[in-house]
């Protein structure tokens, strides 16, 4: 075996139709099915199962006992061809589950790049997760949830199906959201999460200056503190968006809501 050949434990079971790039590592008792592609530099730990159709990019790490690309947990699923697509440099800790899409929901579940999904995270069918997200232990996304970039979800938090969580949002421990969470927003730790301000600390860590954060806070106060009906708040946000691309991003998110906005 050459140095750059896949390194596969003798107890692993790899379907002949699976395609593993150079230097992929596969741990003990792992199962990789047909129609699975795994990019270079990826490490699949012990006791994992990966089912196709699944496409996995470069330099990902599956620590152990992860269940990847399984059939969607949707009674309407009738065996149609659907897929899971994972980007690059993600880390999936113990017992993470990622399901493929459904025919009625677009047929695809997607995970972006540079995400960190901790133990027992579940991402259901037809979800779309962006880049640089952190999902703490037992994070649960129901079907059709969309998560923007740089979102942090704390332990035992979850999102109702079809919800959207905007970029840079933060969900506290145990928060359960049944509505859309605007970008930059913090959601509280009560049983039904409610907005609790702006994720200021996270924005500072990502290089947002005081002027940008101030504009976002003003928009938040307009939306959540001023007591305005949503239609009136949107009028004021439209004015504020002229001077702030971040406020414009919030307004665009609100305008495209399919579920009620979390308020």
UniProtKB/Swiss-Prot annotation:
Pathway: Glycolipid biosynthesis; lipid IV(A) biosynthesis; lipid IV(A) from (3R)-3-hydroxytetradecanoyl-[acyl-carrier-protein] and UDP-N-acetyl-alpha-D-glucosamine: step 1/6
Domain of life: Bacteria
Keyword annotations of the record: Acyltransferase, Cytoplasm, Lipid A biosynthesis, Lipid biosynthesis, Lipid metabolism, Repeat, Transferase
The EC number(s) this enzyme carries: 2.3.1.129
A GO term from the CC aspect: cytoplasm
Any one GO biological process: lipid A biosynthetic process
Subunit structure: Homotrimer.
Function: Involved in the biosynthesis of lipid A, a phosphorylated glycolipid that anchors the lipopolysaccharide to the outer membrane of the cell.
Protein name in UniProt: Acyl-[acyl-carrier-protein]--UDP-N-acetylglucosamine O-acyltransferase
Organism, as annotated: Stenotrophomonas maltophilia (strain K279a)
